[in-house]
């Protein structure tokens, strides 16, 4: 453990489960890097993703965005292509965009597709899938309303998906955000997780949750408080 990391650890009471407001204030005191660190949240859920009805996946637009500039590629044609461009899409195409991806050029972070272009997107599913870029209706990235999808993604939409161990990780802001913005983004994200609770899930749904910065130790959150956020 480095001296810097040890000093940060000493600021956290490891025996305590912090409220959202307390954690949002404390995480501001853990800034140590020379860059604008990402505020990260990690959940451990009491679900078994091997069961289809317990595969937690979705998207949420955070009220204050993520602080990250997101580049969006859109598969659309005709009027839908024009709408995507007007909404601020960085790249809009069809066959040309397929070829670009086949050539290994990824000058974008997220892919959105109109439903009538999913046949094209299917040609490159094996490329996009492993990169986590495959458009999906559950995250709002396959939709006839491509303009809204682009605005949501640009405006701070966070996609989330539980891993095989029941964990969800996401960036919900930057260290430069004030504590209120961090708190409001976190509450919005927690509510989204709670809305996705499977009816078949037994016992405590959110088993553990922690808030941290890119280079900081984790702050344990009070899961009883989180459970009441609907």
Swiss-Prot record:
PROSITE patterns with a match to the protein in the record: RIBOSOMAL_L1
Keywords (A to Z) from UniProt: Repressor, Ribonucleoprotein, Ribosomal protein, RNA-binding, rRNA-binding, Translation regulation, tRNA-binding
Q: Name one GO molecular function term.
A: structural constituent of ribosome
InterPro entries for the chain: Ribosom_uL1_bac-type, Ribosomal_uL1, Ribosomal_uL1-like, Ribosomal_uL1/biogenesis, Ribosomal_uL1_3-a/b-sand, Ribosomal_uL1_CS
What does this protein's UniProt record list under function?
A: Binds directly to 23S rRNA. The L1 stalk is quite mobile in the ribosome, and is involved in E site tRNA release.
The UniProt family comment states: Belongs to the universal ribosomal protein uL1 family.
The protein in question is named Large ribosomal subunit protein uL1
> Lineage of this protein's species?
Bacteria, Pseudomonadati, Campylobacterota, Epsilonproteobacteria, Campylobacterales
């Amino acid at each position: 453990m480095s001296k810097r990391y040890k000093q940060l650890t000493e600021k956290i009471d490891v025996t305590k489960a912090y409220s959202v407001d307390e954690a949002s204030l404390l995480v501001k005191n853990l800034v140590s890097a020379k860059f604008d660190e990402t505020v990260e949240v990690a959940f451990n859920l009491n679900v078994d993703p091997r069961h289809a009805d317990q595969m937690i996946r979705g998207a949420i637009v955070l009220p204050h965005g993520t602080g990250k500039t997101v580049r969006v590629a859109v598969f659309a044609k005709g009027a839908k292509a024009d709408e995507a461009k007007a909404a601020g899409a960085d790249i809009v195409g069809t066959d040309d965009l397929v070829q670009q991806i086949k050539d290994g050029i990824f000058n974008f972070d997220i892919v959105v597709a109109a439903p009538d272009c999913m046949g094209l997107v299917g040609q490159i599913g094996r490329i996009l899938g492993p990169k986590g870029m495959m458009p999906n209706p559950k995250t709002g990235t396959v939709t006839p309303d491509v303009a809204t999808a682009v605005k949501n993604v640009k405006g701070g939409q966070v996609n989330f998906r539980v891993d095989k161990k029941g964990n969800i990780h996401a960036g919900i802001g930057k260290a430069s955000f004030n504590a209120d913005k961090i708190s409001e983004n976190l509450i919005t994200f927690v509510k989204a997780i709670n809305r996705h609770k499977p009816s078949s899930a037994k016992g405590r749904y959110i088993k553990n949750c922690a808030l941290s910065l890119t280079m900081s130790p984790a702050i344990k959150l009070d899961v009883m408080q989180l459970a009441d956020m609907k």
